[in-house]
Every structure is written in C-alpha cells, then in structure tokens.
C-alpha cells in the first residue's frame, strides 16, 4: 500500500479539445489551462478551501489561430503569457477584472512549445519547433523586445524554465539534451549541456524543474521512461533537512553551473513521462502516456543524499482517460495538485 494517497477532489470541464498545460497563479488562487481548442481558461474557486468548487471565471480566445501549447503567469499574477502552434506568443493583463491582450511576440518560424517568465518579470523565454530559444525583455508601454536568440539545440525544443535566481535558463528538447544558459553581461551563452551518449537521457526530454527548497537540484523527465536528478559536482554528501533553504546549494552557483546526474529513477513508468513538478514537501509528481500520475520522494526524510534511495509514494492508475500532459503543485497549498490530459479534462487532487 502506498504511504500517501492522491484523492480526486474535482474535475474541470469546458475545453473542446486536449488540454496541454496548466499553471497556477503565484498566489495559488487561480489556475490557467490551455488547449487544442485555441483557448485559455482561467479557473477560480468560490471559497479558500481545496475541496470547494472551482469555476471558469474567464475564457481568453480570438487571439491564437492554432493550438495553445503553454501558459505562464507573471510573478505578480497580473499577467499571462501564452504560446501557440501559430508561431506567436501573446501577453495578457488583468485590469478591473477583465483580461486584455496587450502584446504579441512574433519571431519563431513555427510552433512555439513553451513559455516561461523569469522571477522578476523582466524577461520571457520561449522555445519551439524551429530548434531555437528566444529571450524577450519587457519594455515601457507594454512592449517586448527580443534580446537574444539561441540555436544550441539540434532538434525541436520542448521546454524552458528559469532558475529561481533568474541567473540561469534551462532548455530541453527532442535532441535528448538539456542546456543551461547564463548571461555574461552582453549575451546569453550555453554554460553546460547535460546529456549525450551514456551521460543522460536516451530520448526526448519533455520537462524540467528545480527543487524549490535547495534550489540546487534539477529534475528532468523523458521519452526513455526515466526521471533524472542533476546536482552540482561540488554538492556536499548530505544536507540535514532542518538546514535553512538554500543550504543544500553549497557548491552550486547558478551563473556557473556544473551539474552531474546524481540519480536515475526508472522502473516506475511504462510509457513516456511528459511532465513533472517538484513540491516543497519533497514529492515529485509526474504525468505520463500511461494515463497515470505518480508521486515520488526520497525514502529518507532526514537526509538529502546524492544517489539516495527514491521510491514511488503514491500512484493513480488511469488518472485520466488519455495521456497526462501536465502536472503542477499549487504554490500556496503544496498538497493540491492539478493535472490535464488529452481527454480534455483538468483534474484536481489532494495529497493525503
């Protein structure tokens, strides 16, 4: 019997096609979803309790002409960025209770696969099928200017995410690699590539995320059915769980990354792992092509050890009726999980 249970507490319907991505607002009081139906839906809850009913408070449409693949909140929670297969990114702002499109970012040659806002809200990163990573800077007058384009990947780029410091950008893609980008005062350059024959994932890397507590470990998931945990080569052999946030980052400098694969988690998934998210509780949730959701954690709650033993602590078989495309923990209530799927539904789960 699993030590924890993911209890279903809600199913949100309304999209007319597969739901690709979900994202919680920084305050955790709203959830954005995007779909093949070319819309974004904003979900709000009537009462501040996880089991209360969530409802669709806004529909953002008439912007993109093809599938919306990714959605990201600004750090303030007052703006959204949406990335589409129509090769554009839209920026929306909430004003007097109404969402308004205020900018459109054009430049990618074809499908944009992911969008991510940096921690101070000044930069937006995007990536796409054209093998590129773009970095955009917010300018006065609700304008955005492309300040750099990186062509380091040899194939489709699936995901981008920022380190919490904002000093490091991570991209991952169809070429089986993860690239770490840093800024030298003039441009962004590739500081490290994770992967390659025998040193990383053996197939497409679909998603990446940082450990929100130590901020020094990176997790990735792949078409090769595994998760990999990357940490600094200079990391200590163990860090007490009672240590202050960031203590485990000893030896890790975001502007000078030097990561290695410390743990490979295998045997838990039978099909592609499309998404993962690391909660402050230490649990990593995953969503896969077997329609399942898993929550994995290190077996020891006292030590964070490189190469430590990890286990599957909760599993929901057939959590959806089709591929689970995205899983995200709520930032304000770390036991509340959202998932979305090719079945067109968003589901909410409570970890017990």
Swiss-Prot record:
GO BP annotations of the record are: iron-sulfur cluster assembly
Instruction: Tell me where the WD repeats sit in this chain.
Output: 14-53, 63-102, 107-146, 152-191, 200-240, 268-306, 319-352
- Single GO cellular component annotation? cytosolic [4Fe-4S] assembly targeting complex
Q: Which SUPFAM superfamilies match?
A: WD40 repeat-like (SSF50978)
InterPro entries referenced in this protein's UniProt entry, alphabetically: CIAO1/Cia1 (IPR028608), G-protein_beta_WD-40_rep (IPR020472), WD40/YVTN_repeat-like_dom_sf (IPR015943), WD40_repeat_CS (IPR019775), WD40_repeat_dom_sf (IPR036322), WD40_rpt (IPR001680)
The record's section on Pfam families has:
WD40 (PF00400)
Q: Does the keyword Glycosyltransferase apply?
A: no
Note the superkingdom of the native organism: Eukaryota
* Annotated keywords: Repeat, WD repeat
State whether keyword Nucleotide-binding applies. no
Assigned protein family: Belongs to the WD repeat CIA1 family.
> What biological function has been recorded for the protein in this entry?
Essential component of the cytosolic iron-sulfur (Fe/S) protein assembly machinery. Required for the maturation of extramitochondrial Fe/S proteins.
Protein name as catalogued: Probable cytosolic iron-sulfur protein assembly protein CIAO1 homolog
């Amino acid at each position: 019997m699993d030590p924890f249970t993911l209890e279903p507490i809600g199913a949100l319907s309304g999209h007319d096609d597969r739901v690709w991505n979900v994202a919680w607002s920084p305050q955790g009081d709203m959830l954005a979803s995007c779909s093949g139906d070319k819309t974004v839906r904003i979900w709000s809850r009537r009462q501040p309790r996880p089991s209360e009913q969530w409802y669709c408070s806004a529909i953002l449409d008439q912007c993109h002409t093809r599938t919306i693949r990714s959605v990201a909140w600004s750090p303030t929670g007052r703006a959204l960025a949406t990335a589409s297969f129509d090769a554009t990114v839209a920026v929306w702002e909430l004003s007097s209770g109404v969402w308004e499109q205020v900018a459109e970012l054009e430049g990618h040659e074809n499908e944009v696969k992911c969008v991510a806002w940096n921690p101070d809200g000044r930069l937006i990163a995007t990536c796409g099928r054209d093998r590129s990573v773009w970095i955009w800077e917010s300018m006065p007058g609700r304008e955005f200017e492309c300040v750099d384009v990186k062509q380091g990947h040899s194939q489709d780029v699936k995901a981008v995410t920022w380190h919490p410091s904002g000093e490091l950008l991570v991209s991952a893609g169809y070429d089986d690699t993860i690239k770490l980008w840093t800024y030298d005062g003039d441009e962004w350059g590739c500081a490290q590539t994770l992967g390659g024959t025998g040193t990383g994932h053996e197939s497409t890397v679909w998603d990446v995320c940082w450990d929100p507590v130590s901020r020094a470990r990176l997790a990735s998931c792949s078409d090769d059915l595994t998760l990999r945990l990357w940490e600094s080569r200079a990391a200590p052999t163990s860090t007490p769980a009672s240590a202050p946030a960031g203590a485990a980052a000893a030896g890790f400098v975001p502007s000078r990354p030097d990561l290695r694969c410390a743990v490979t988690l295998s045997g838990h998934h039978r099909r592609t792992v499309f998404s993962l998210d690391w909660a402050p509780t230490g649990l990593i949730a995953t969503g896969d092509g077997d329609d399942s959701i898993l929550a994995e954690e290190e077996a020891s709650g006292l030590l964070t050890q490189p190469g430590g033993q990890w286990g599957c602590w909760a599993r929901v078989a057939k959590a959806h009726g089709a591929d689970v495309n995205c899983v995200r923990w709520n930032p304000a209530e770390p036991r509340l999980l959202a998932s979305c799927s090719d079945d067109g539904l968003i589901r909410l789960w409570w970890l017990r």
